């Protein structure tokens, strides 16, 4: 509710200093992690201060277990002091230079090979996030968002299989949202 009354420029001021640290290009990994932890703590505090109820954290997973930008969400998972609820949003499309207006230049191809082995490997990676007490639930089910489910071959079969794996892992049901 508190965010409703902020203008764009006020919101930009609130978040601006957090976005200015160039932690991706830092060579010193320990220093980068320290800075990330500080930023994550500040974002957590600001989110609660301004009435944000949780975060949807982007998750990038490609065939053959290729991931990008995984460390920030893993650090979030490891830091229980960041006490804001979260869910993961699988950005499940081909990675191209779309942000530069060049969606023809493919950086990482997303193929969605429809095998239970690949689905299980992906699920096993996600399981610690699903087990986390901060995971957002809807009607008692763990929320997992998929950006473009229609791109996944045999998506219905995959979702049924993940639900089965979730029950076997003892975490209950999954709530899928697109």
What is each of the regions a protein language model found here?
Residues 1-178:
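Glycan-processing catalytic domains of CAZymes
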């Amino acid at each position: 509710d508190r965010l409703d009354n902020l203008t764009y420029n006020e919101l930009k001021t609130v978040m601006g200093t957090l976005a200015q640290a160039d932690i991706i290009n830092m060579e010193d990994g320990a220093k980068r992690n320290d800075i990330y932890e500080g930023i994550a703590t500040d974002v957590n505090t600001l989110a609660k201060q301004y009435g944000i109820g949780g975060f949807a954290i982007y998750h990038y997973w490609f065939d053959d277990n290729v991931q990008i930008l995984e460390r920030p969400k893993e650090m979030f998972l490891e830091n229980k002091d960041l006490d804001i609820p979260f869910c993961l949003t699988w950005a499940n499309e081909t990675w191209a230079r779309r942000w530069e207006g060049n969606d023809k230049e493919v950086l990482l191809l997303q193929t969605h090979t429809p095998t239970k082995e690949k689905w299980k490997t992906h699920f096993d990676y996600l399981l610690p996030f699903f087990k986390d007490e901060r995971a957002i639930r809807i009607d008692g089910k763990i929320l997992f968002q998929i950006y473009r489910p229609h791109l996944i071959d045999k998506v219905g079969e995959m979702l049924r299989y993940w639900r089965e794996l979730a029950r076997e892992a003892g975490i209950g049901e999954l709530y899928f949202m697109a």
